[in-house]
Amino acid sequence: VREVLVLLSGVALSLAMGHPWACFHGDPQHSGRSSNVVGAPLTRVEARGLGGKVSGSPVVRQDGFVLVGARDVRLYCLGPALDTLLWVADLTPYGSSIYYSAPALDDSNNVYITTNRRLVKLSSNGVVLWSWPANNSLSISHSPVIGQDGKVYFACYSDSLYALTPEGTLAWAYPLGRAANSAPVVGLDGNILVATTRGSAPWPLFCIEPDGDLHWVHNLDGDAEFSSPAVGPDGAVYIGANRYLYAVRSDGTLKWRDSLLARVQSCPAVANESTLYVVAGAGLYCVDTDSGVRWRRSIGGSNYCSPAVDAEGNIYVGTASGTSSRFWCIAPDSTVRDSHLIGSDIWSSPAISGRGIYFGTMADTMYLFQGPGSGAVECRVPAGPSGMRLLPNPTRGVVRIAPSGRYSARVFDAGGVLVARTLDADRLDLSGLRRGIYMVAVPGAQPCKVVLR
């Protein structure tokens, strides 16, 4: 029997917090989902100029500092309010640009990022620890991801998926047979998934085991150009390929395929076990994970920005429409809650933390917006080594504990008083409690939040 400890917001936590947004699209599964709430209306807090265009995405580490790469081949570490610069790392010896790469943070605050030529590892204070390969021989555009085994994975135009140890040694390279122009993702089982582009049909979606062996391959009818996969709570893989959106089961079999009105050039956001959001062309789509498209909201532009979802289900996304580019907050029912004219293309995908929401623009600028829910304790819902999650989150009462098993759970009120207890069960019933944000601590994982509506 495993034990899950549920604490109400405001109760002191002794365990270290995890990174609120640890890598591209938040976590190694690319869920795009946060356990923090931003809400609407949005207020612009800061717009900070950098030394180059920001087409990659920011990440937020556990102390609130924001890291982002720019096309001037520098990695910036900014204060939580973007008003201070902790350090900047010059990566020009390792490439000539940072295209769409977001940093990836490990548990020690070390940083991995790809330039257009190499994978670079830096310490928490911006010192380069190593780079790979030793020469600028690769062509890389997208983000690395850290696996459950600590290895770092990235794909490139040279037709291979690479795995490196934390010490910078090549563990293996898997030949994909064609180019990869998107970021790999880590499945709940630890396998690595990567999509392909260029050439002619079919375009393989690969599932590679952590030791470099092929687990399965599923052929897609469209190419995944700028389209990275995301993994759902049940292990299903969601991937846009040209004008199709695919759901592929964790065993490699097709669950469904839906046709959209435009090419998908971003990563889906998995709001919960039944809902995901994806951008295709000028539209934001809400998709039922069983039955397909629920609604489409026009947001304008031809977009590369991957949407992000907060703990209340609000969706945040930017557009690339030149001087008409906007940043949107959209409710789960497709209602526009707020939008702000930014005036420059937003290719960067937003990152959510307790401080607010961050994104960059092609006008060399990083933005911080806050909403009514900003300022909460920094925390995110980690999958952990076993893929453990509380589902659905947000919830209206009953929360299922995944993966399936028998758990002992205790629930405390704001004063730390035990108000409920569950023994040897696979779910928690919070329906007798008032609405609010609860802190969840799982032995062996970081504390996280569950929102009771």
Q: Where are the language model's segments positioned?
A:
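Extracellular low-complexity Ser/Thr/Asn/Gly-rich intrinsically disordered segments
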Residues: S374-R380
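Positively charged n-region of N-terminal signal peptides that target proteins for export
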Residues: V1-V4, L452-R453
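Secretory-pathway ectodomains
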Residues: M17-S374
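Bacterial N-terminal signal peptides
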Residues: V6-S14
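C-terminal outer-membrane/trafficking sorting elements
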Residues: R380-R453
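Positively charged, low-complexity intrinsically disordered regions
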Residues: E3, D63, D149, N219, ...
